């Protein structure tokens, strides 16, 4: 059986890891052993934060809706209850966008909600 020399595959593997570590500071970007650890850790952070991002954006949308609703005399929970009673099925992302960029449209939704809550 011939002897297997791994120069080509090792070089390719090193190049791949160092390419992923491009832009890292210090030896994390140019020493394979350290770059490999840094790339692994970066992947763990990326995996974790793709899930965290969903929670963070939901919190942001709720905070924006709450602030806009309070300006018009309702709390977030009252507003959410009124939306359900009025059968308005707009998600939080769209409501937050309306609250920030189209105050008139958000105001009309709040008026519909207030009417349903009063009835």
UniProtKB/Swiss-Prot annotation:
Coiled-coil intervals, chain numbering: none
Assigned GO CC terms: ribonucleoprotein complex; ribosome
Stored InterPro entries: Ribosomal_bL20, RIBOSOMAL_L20_CS, Ribosomal_protein_bL20_C
Cross-referenced PROSITE patterns: RIBOSOMAL_L20
Gene Ontology MF term list: rRNA binding; structural constituent of ribosome
Superkingdom: Bacteria
An individual GO BP term: translation
SUPFAM superfamilies assigned to the protein according to its UniProt record, in alphabetical order: Ribosomal protein L20
Entry keyword set: Ribonucleoprotein, Ribosomal protein, RNA-binding, rRNA-binding
Pfam families recorded: Ribosomal_L20 (PF00453)
Similarity remark: Belongs to the bacterial ribosomal protein bL20 family.
Name of the protein in its database record: Large ribosomal subunit protein bL20
Annotated source species: Acidovorax sp. (strain JS42)
Gene: rplT
